[in-house]
């Protein structure tokens, strides 16, 4: 192709607008470049070095060729691998740059030279200099020459930027001092554009800075002393740029400084005062451009995040900037747009996140998390006082907004008094005349309901009336938003307390769901209906939903009709949220009320299958994600309906699992942009979608295993081929795929002729082992894997007991124990490293360090407890068959954990020690519970002493008392009549009585303390059942003992298992007409029975099929007591409102 034809081709690539013709032109261009590389390079170099209108465009295309091909292949192809040809081309480009006056032309030419310099210097710095001496000679001759234009100096610095991107070792070999001096000269240049180019060089160098400021002799890093000189000059230079109102160059310089603070904030440590002056100097004057203020806010937030001891160095300066600028900026919504806000479908995301408001919100979120409660909350209280004295709309908005933004960062240490202050402030603001302020109050309540839960919910008497009142706000956006806050608040509110407001909630839902066409009203009312499914009794929820289901189904019908008319339509976030809430509400109602919803389930699933086919313009795949979540809910409740929908679901999931979450950007060769480097993109939405897909699969495998069996082999192959279980960068995707692997054996057992259980076990177990051997650096991941393993162990062991197929039994058991031991070792190491890092973090004060260490130890404790669950699963699933490996494998684990507690106890008790003791005892409890007394006794006997000792009240570690009281109770239940237990009764009764008394007094109020209380109460009852004479002698007679116990039993509420145990005990006493219950203690017994059976756990008890005998016994008791005159009605009247409500529903159903 001759030069004229090539120039014409370039012109067409640059200007052609017709899509089809443009594609033809581009295809021709690519074909020419591939088939005639020598001609292509010769022509494009001619264009680059000419003065044609296409020269800059050609320079961009050629640089991309150089960068994307890896070895400057475009040039080398032209010379058939001859470096001299490359050299000639680059010298020509250099000479062309030296003769230019246009800044754009110089920029594009310098970028080509920069890429070339980077390539020849990165592997051999000194040899690379020899390959291109002309450049370094020109640099020395021209850069400092008085006649050199600022544009050319910028071009040279653009080239130097690429050299600075190499490791500092390479820079020093090239001539480090000369390059450093050159950058210093650029920073001091009179032209701001030159200074900006020099700052970009500093930014490239900063990647190799020494953040510890200790080792200045290591030539692989730039000493901080040099970097700090650079940064100091940048900070000095910026005010002059801004003073000249050269905001464009100042913005570029500030962007680079922000990057430096982000990558190596320690460099700024000696300049905190200078940065403070710079920040205030930019934020104070009103005439300074907002773009600079936005960047300055980011700079300040990075300063707070990345300088370890910033609070000690500059607490006063930080406080001033937060109070004077960050807080007020959090109220700067654009009031001129309020009318548009009122009609917006998405008022919650209406404000521009690129405004000062958006930047301030983001910065305050980071700052509050970094600086913490002790710095931020006092400033909030001061700002509230300031806003009260200066109650502008923006100040009032800022107050509520600040509470919202800082909630997560302050949650660790916030006190009840702080929450009261916060609620009272919000109550006052809730009456503000401006809609935006009232809306922000609701945003704050919604966020605080999550971050300060459950303490925040203890003030429901203040918050709930406010929310139900604001649901009737004259501004529909505010009224609708109140429902969102209600959903968050109710999520952590106790069921009994929710019932206090049920009558106020129903008209709110009716108004916003049935009587409003406002999108946000409909969306949030659907969410509120869904949230009440877990709170209300089924009958109450059914009564509510009878009116709502037809209306919600009508909503869904309208959505489907709209999508059918425009299957490729674009849906904004509010519309997507609305559809997702419909799907959520319908699937939850279907799951909660299967009989009521049964007529609608097939049409719903049919419509959901149709949703799979719509190509909605939604980059985040939100609608597909919500559809899959709805499917996962429905499969749990309607497994018999599901198999006929299996094929389209599996087909869609296969499409999802084939998606790539990482894509290399195919840069459009013909698009001219400032940032046009080749890169790759990770799509979190694909990862989320695949994680949800595995969640759906695991539900199908559990609920319809036989129907899934034909797909199992292909599914496991997909996991292996894509390495979801070993190589995924998404924790949830990895864990969900492992959960599916652990469920595979259940599928094989359900359909052994389709999927051979031994073969599936061999494959799935091998995959599980591979997953555990992949890189894991988080305690939580080990815990989650162990949680999935418990399910696998249960399914596998049940199969062994039913089939006696011992093919790989011993090998499997040994490997599980080996894996768990390795998990334990790895978690210990991670715990030690995490604690060491926290204790060495200078940015944390002692109280924060203690809190974070405690949280980390809690994670470790949860992991050890989960490992104990896996060990205990063997006992539960195998019973006495587990004896084969109990002594050689499990008992050493228990001994090791107990010994760790006892041997280190003299040095004080830590959370980790407690975890090992409680976990060891919980395994012993499983052995007692699931093995026969004859086989379990010898295993447990060596540990009885430590169990009994630790029923003694330990106020600091009451969870020890909880598990030991529970296990001691099991000993009396399983080994009833054993004379060795009788001698323990005085000690145990004294310990239980002390624990009960302390908790009852209110001295201990934690969840663990309340559970320990429940266990102590049932322990005393189990001792009385096993040894009634001994207990009667110690308690003033059995009648007196049971009278006292029944009063205590009525208050058992935390531990569901102990609630059930207490109910069973009372039922059995009624069944045998025990005089200790049926005579003088009848009222006590009935009150305790009603409080327990119709209390907080009533719903979960009656919906659990394993409790059929208990439910039948409870019905018998109520029938039996009905013949005792008015005693039942009188006793019910003394019970709580919630108990009365549940009892009333029970009687109405029975009638």
Swiss-Prot record:
Listed GO biological process terms: positive regulation of gene expression; protein import into nucleus
UniProt-annotated location(s): Nucleus intermembrane space; Cytoplasm; Nucleus
Entry protein name: Importin beta
Keywords: Cytoplasm, Nucleus, Protein transport, Repeat, Transport
This protein's domain notes: Lacks the importin beta N-terminal (IBN) domain.
Gene3D superfamilies: Leucine-rich Repeat Variant (1.25.10.10)
Molecular functions per Gene Ontology: nuclear import signal receptor activity; nuclear localization sequence binding
Organism (species): Giardia intestinalis (strain ATCC 50803 / WB clone C6)
